[in-house]
Amino acid sequence: MDMRVPAQLLGLLLLWLPDTRCDIQMTQSPSSLSASVGDRVTITCRASQGISNYLAWYQQKPGKVPKLLIYAASTLQSGVPSRFSGSGSGTDFTLTISSLQPEDVATYYCQKYNSAP
């Protein structure tokens, strides 16, 4: 029995910060994917200019508010399963799900920020 799990991803996320000199574009890839339960899944996020480690990852399920997974690029929010991990600094960031579970079907967002989210 094929237990493929689709995961929707946000392909492009533009955010504006009023105290920055120019807008920083955040681009995620892939824009969508299909994976099986147990697979290792990697989502990347690229900033148009360096943002140090001021990056958060969110998970949003239909009809629910976004849930913070990771902040400061690699710090796991309390209560988030250890199969989620984040890495990167500067312009290139990665969210990894080490072993995909059915409950991980969601939309995933990266977001830059100026201080703790």
Swiss-Prot record:
Where is the region Framework-2? Answer: 57-71
Which parts of the sequence belong to the Ig-like domain?
A: 23-117
Framework-1: where is this region? 23-45
Q: Where in the cell is it found?
A: Secreted; Cell membrane
Q: Which residues lie within the region annotated Complementarity-determining-3? A: 111-117
What InterPro entries does this protein's entry cite?
Ig-like_dom, Ig-like_dom_sf, Ig-like_fold, Ig_sub, Ig_V-set, IgV_Light_Chain
Q: How does it assemble?
A: Immunoglobulins are composed of two identical heavy chains and two identical light chains; disulfide-linked.
Q: What is this protein called?
A: Immunoglobulin kappa variable 1-27
